[in-house]
Amino acid sequence: MSDQVVHSFRWTQSLRRGLSNWTCPVKADVLNDTRALLSGLDFAKVASVQRMMRRDKRDESDLTSLRDLNKEVDSLMTMKSTQKNMFLKVGSLSKGELMELSGDLNKLKDKVQRTERPPGSGGQYQGNLTTTQLTRRGELLQFIGIQKAGRVGMNGVVKVWDVKDSSLMINQFGSMPALTISCMAEQGGETLNDVVQGLTDLGLLYTAKYPNLNDLEALSEKHPCLKVITQEESQINISGYNLSLSAAVKAGACLIDGGNMLETIKIDTSTFTTVIKTLLEVKARERMFVSSVPGQRNPYENILYKLCLSGEGWPYIASRSQIKGRAWDNTVVEFDSAPPRAPVPVRNGGAPLLGPLRPELEDQVRKGVEGLSPNLTTWIDIEGPPNDPVELAIYQPETQKYLHCYRRPNDIKSFKDQSKYCHGILLKDVENARPGLISTIIRYLPKSMVFTAQGEDDIKRLFDMHGRQDLKIVDVKLSAEQSRVFEELVWKKFEHLCDRHKGIVIKSKKKGSKPASTNAHCALMDCIMFNAVLVGFVADEKPKRLLPIDILFREPDTTVVL
């Protein structure tokens, strides 16, 4: 694919849009870490490492100095990635998606290794050969005609690490916004506020284009603090202590509100597979690929590597120097699906568990429910009757967190009537909804939790059927007209959160009443619009999904054990 064109910034913009659900405000966290570094870091050691990184040749003691300082920085920061190796199996992703991911990781591995060891040059790292051996090898390559005399590496500089254990270099490079900002303020003699203002403008420019050295020079006239940023072209494996343009741009991306900047993505084990699935979808739409050409990573390669390095934390901006292994080591693709769990024996008087979830899926649901705060306002709504619900939504407006899932109905005739006059869900769109989700969610809800609802009868019956008489419901009792004041605005803002209400909904023809809305009723949208009626506005903040998308539906050929 070396002849294909990388539309770098267009890809970046597409990734920003596609992965916007996992971007979050990080400015406060970054500045808190910045202040911690300013007060606790020895900048004499920082200056020493910066001098070392400017040298063409480095040895074991230099690597030890870099690793020690990285460990000190990591201990002062709260934004750090933790070692969470991920194991992806059929079920969390389809077999085709797993094969695509595995292939891309292998291609990326080959590219990175070729980039670090460019043929015929000293490269960034050349195994555990000594400097003398490297020099002698270069002479031999010239003698047999493979390498031209006087040839050096890319950018005209040979960077050599003369170390025995190359694994100690892994994850010791790369910039962190908190470190970049603290170095600019402390070593540049600038106030923290001036640095933040300058980098914010650089970040705003980054929403429209990749800032280059000419842009940096122009912005430096307005913000003199930016003059400490190096005017050199980007290189492979430069230290996070070097004030490069790319490091400054990354810091700027974290200081602006909005923009869906990739740098602000945060993942954890419950959202990892969903993020990967979405990434592959964006890749397909934009025809992204892993290039075979050695050198800097393109936007898709970059985010793929960062996501797969660790399943928990901020892939772009956190301290990751304590992570062991690389992306292809820490994200393992397994093509053999786990055997289904044997059904639990039914005791006398007990109700059978229909469509039980596998332990790992049940654990993800439990973690999702634990993401709710028991003491906050919590809306709940269902579509379908309480004895045969087809959709459940639970929404907390203060945190914008929500649980949302579907269920295949048992009574198909009744379902089709409700679809025509109410929710607009088509049977084919919930045919493969994973059984057991609604029951599992209700089972793990905190004891005596209070819910807010528009109409309590159906919700109470649903809770009672699951033996949860301890759960309490507050009925707001809005009129039909009141409840839908914000309907159009809510659908306009958040329709991307729900794509299962595709059917045509027919207006009501009851005598003496106005025709009902022709918009389909969605449990999640209803929760958001009911809350908007009570507070008087629709929040701009993006709702945050607590259940991974990939567990909501199963593969069509999956057998359900009853």
UniProtKB/Swiss-Prot annotation:
Cystine connections: none
Q: Where is this site: Important for exonuclease activity?
A: 458
| Cellular component terms per the entry's GO annotation | helical viral capsid; host cell cytoplasm; ribonucleoprotein complex; viral nucleocapsid
Identify the keywords attached in UniProt to this record, alphabetized.
Capsid protein, Helical capsid protein, Host cytoplasm, Host-virus interaction, Hydrolase, Inhibition of host IKBKE by virus, Inhibition of host innate immune response by virus, Inhibition of host RLR pathway by virus, Interferon antiviral system evasion, Manganese, Metal-binding, Ribonucleoprotein, RNA-binding, Viral immunoevasion, Viral nucleoprotein, Virion, Zinc
User: Origin, by domain of life?
Assistant: Viruses
Gene Ontology molecular-function annotations: hydrolase activity; metal ion binding; RNA binding
- Biological process (GO) annotations? negative stranded viral RNA replication; RNA-templated viral transcription; symbiont-mediated suppression of host cytoplasmic pattern recognition receptor signaling pathway via inhibition of IKBKE activity
Give the span(s) annotated as Binding site for the cap structure m7GTP.
53-238
Q: Which residues bind Mn(2+)?
A: 381, 383, 526
Keyword Ribonucleoprotein assigned to the entry: answer is yes
Enzyme kind, highest EC tier? hydrolase
Question: Subunit structure, per the record?
Answer: Homomultimerizes to form the nucleocapsid. Binds to viral genomic RNA. Interacts with glycoprotein G2. Interacts with protein Z; this interaction probably directs the encapsidated genome to budding sites. Interacts with protein L; this interaction does not interfere with Z-L interaction. Interacts with host IKBKE (via Protein kinase domain); the interaction inhibits IKBKE kinase activity.
Family, per entry: Belongs to the arenaviridae nucleocapsid protein family.
- Cited function: Encapsidates the genome, protecting it from nucleases. The encapsidated genomic RNA is termed the nucleocapsid (NC). Serves as template for viral transcription and replication. The increased presence of protein N in host cell does not seem to trigger the switch from transcription to replication as observed in other negative strain RNA viruses.
Q: What is this protein called?
A: Nucleoprotein
Give the classification, highest ranks. Answer: Viruses, Riboviria, Orthornavirae, Negarnaviricota, Polyploviricotina
